[in-house]
């Protein structure tokens, strides 16, 4: 059987890289280093979807764009409610 006849398995989560928590920590630190209010900037990004709220400093913008906004919000709600399962 050739490799073209085999079904490949793709695991989306395996290729994600950093988890949401680590990404938010890095973005928060980058915003602080640039003198911004990190909470306001992250909330602005999550509400608007405009990546201009996140600086390119320390690759923060590219890091946060690797996650969907709804995924970030879901993780924040789970964390807030203590439902990190």
From Swiss-Prot:
Pfam families per record: IreB
Q: Signal sequence span per UniProt?
A: none
Q: Which family does it belong to?
A: Belongs to the UPF0297 family.
Name of the featured protein: UPF0297 protein LBA0418
Protein source organism: Lactobacillus acidophilus (strain ATCC 700396 / NCK56 / N2 / NCFM)
Source species taxonomy: Bacteria, Bacillati, Bacillota, Bacilli, Lactobacillales
